[in-house]
């Protein structure tokens, strides 16, 4: 029933998008202008609210959005004017899609591996696999939001518009991915590193970011968040691990190019030999890439999953498809620091 209702809304979205009046509309000023126009057109956000896209979203407004997406009565919130955090927005939308159980599977798998995930881990994993979050255009990092910050109407509109595009196959894919998210037994040091990594799920992608706050140890940044190499630095170089020895010294360069080039070719870890907490490097030519061609990186969780900071922010993803094709090589800082034994 939910899929038929979403299909009806999607048909309405397409009709409005292709109409002459909409085609002649003046370009908006919000990064999510198209999505704001969509949710107003289908009646799940008031035009007056959409006109102030950077205003914090209220519980009452979120209730209206969810009711519109699910074709149910608007729930009477006891605090309709209260603000909604980004984490709460994602959790509510994941629930509206009927994917709460899938979110629980992600969380339980991380708990079983001993990684002590935060309560938002599962819903943030699902929200990002669905594409409900996105990186803002260059120059707008100041608009990025951390999980505990109030969500804006623009963020809610983007997510709702994305949901209108989803079909039954999309939700089925999430259910299948959640069922496949089973992590291996890890060593004490792998557990330490991965526990740090999963703590940051849901933080936004911020260019040149390497801290969860503006006050980075390496200088101020526009907003708390990470780019792909900055996320790895935060986990491996900034975090203070008891008895970590030389671990922070293993990574010298800050970029993907530098970190991938610091490991000699003979010590690069191939795809089939990856272990939890290994660094992953990606390049356009896959294993034939040169360090200068490595343009993305992440941290391996195990059993075909990794965590990284991408256009969806800090998220987990399966190491398959596009990522498997572009996988260049891995690196094992824990071995370099003498904290794990050779395989």
Q: Which residues does each predicted region cover?
A:
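Aromatic- and glycine-rich peptidoglycan recognition patches
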Residues: 156, 162, 247-248, 252-260, ...
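Non-catalytic ligand/cofactor/substrate-binding and regulatory segments of enzyme domains
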Residues: 23, 165-205, 326-343
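Bacterial N-terminal signal peptides that target proteins for export
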Residues: 1-10
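Extracellular/periplasmic catalytic domains that process cell-envelope and extracellular macromolecules
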Residues: 39, 119, 125-128, 187-192, ...
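Glycine-rich, acidic and aromatic/proline-enriched surface loops and short helix-turn segments
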Residues: 38, 68, 95, 99, ...
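Feature responds to low-complexity, polar/acidic, surface-exposed segments characteristic
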Residues: 15-17, 21-33, 40-59, 63, ...
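Catalytic cysteine-centered active-site loop
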Residues: 206-276, 286-287, 326
């Amino acid at each position: 029933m939910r899929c038929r209702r979403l299909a009806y809304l999607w048909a309405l979205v397409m009709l409005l998008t292709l109409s002459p009046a909409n085609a002649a509309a003046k370009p908006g000023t919000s990064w999510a202008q198209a999505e704001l126009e969509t949710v107003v057109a289908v009646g799940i956000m008031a035009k007056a609210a959409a006109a102030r896209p950077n205003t914090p979203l209220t519980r009452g407004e979120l209730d209206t959005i969810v009711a519109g997406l699910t074709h149910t009565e608007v729930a009477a919130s006891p605090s309709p004017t209260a603000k909604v955090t980004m984490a709460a927005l994602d959790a509510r939308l994941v629930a509206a899609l009927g994917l709460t159980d899938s979110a629980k599977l992600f969380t339980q798998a991380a708990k079983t591996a001993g990684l002590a995930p935060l309560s938002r881990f599962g819903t943030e994993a699902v929200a990002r696999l669905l594409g409900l979050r996105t990186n803002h255009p260059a120059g707008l990092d100041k608009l990025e939001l951390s999980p505990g910050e109030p969500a804006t109407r623009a963020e809610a509109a983007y997510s709702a518009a994305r949901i209108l595009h989803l079909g039954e196959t999309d939700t089925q894919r999430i259910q299948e991915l959640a069922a496949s998210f089973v992590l291996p037994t890890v060593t004490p040091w792998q557990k330490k590193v991965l526990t740090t990594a999963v703590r940051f799920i849901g933080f936004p992608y911020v260019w040149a970011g390497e801290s969860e706050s503006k006050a980075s140890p390496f200088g101020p940044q526009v907003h708390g968040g990470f780019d792909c190499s900055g996320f790895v630095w935060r986990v491996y170089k900034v975090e203070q691990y008891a008895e970590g020895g030389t671990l922070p010294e293993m990574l010298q360069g800050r970029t993907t190019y530098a970190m991938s080039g610091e490991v000699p070719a003979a010590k690069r870890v191939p795809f089939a030999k990856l272990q939890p907490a290994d660094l992953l490097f990606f390049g356009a030519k896959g294993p034939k890439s040169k360090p200068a061609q490595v343009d993305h990186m992440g941290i391996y969780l195990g059993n075909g999953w990794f965590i990284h900071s991408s256009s969806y922010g800090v998220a987990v993803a399966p190491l398959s498809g596009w990522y498997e094709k572009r996988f260049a090589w891995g690196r094992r800082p824990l071995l370099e620091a003498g904290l794990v034994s050779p395989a």
